[in-house]
């Protein structure tokens, strides 16, 4: 892809540990060496964001079959609006990860160094009270 947009979506049904601004900053720090990355935020449907920004393809990582069931439904809805979805299999070493697991480990000083970039690790430890 010539340009990759990493969009932080505001989900009112989830309680995020970090603000949208904090999440955007962590993504920018993590991807600073990749010149074709654009970081943005959006409140609404992903497909509407794509249409408004002339994006034809959404890429999604899949950890397990349970991810695929949900994501396939979303992909079919998005395809009706003219936006395709490309699925990428997660590295098996990371297929068990979830944000709740990483937050729990950080809270109790578990080693998350192989699970998140260093800047995210620092932010998580600070936010959760870990050391």
Report residues per predicted region.
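Nucleotidyltransferase catalytic core that binds NTPs
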Residues: 1-131
């Amino acid at each position: 892809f010539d340009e990759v947009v990493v969009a932080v979506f505001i989900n009112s049904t989830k309680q995020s540990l970090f603000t949208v601004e904090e999440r955007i900053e962590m993504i920018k720090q993590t991807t600073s060496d990749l010149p074709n990355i654009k970081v943005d935020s959006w409140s609404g449907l992903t497909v509407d964001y794509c249409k408004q920004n002339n994006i034809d393809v959404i890429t999604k990582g899949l950890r397990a079959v349970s991810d695929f069931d949900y994501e396939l439904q979303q992909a079919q809805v998005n395809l009706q609006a003219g936006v395709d979805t490309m699925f990428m299999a997660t590295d098996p070493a990371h297929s068990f990860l979830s944000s709740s697991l990483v937050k729990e480990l950080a809270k109790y000083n578990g080693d998350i160094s192989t699970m998140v970039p260093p800047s995210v690790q620092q932010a998580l430890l600070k936010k959760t009270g870990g050391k």
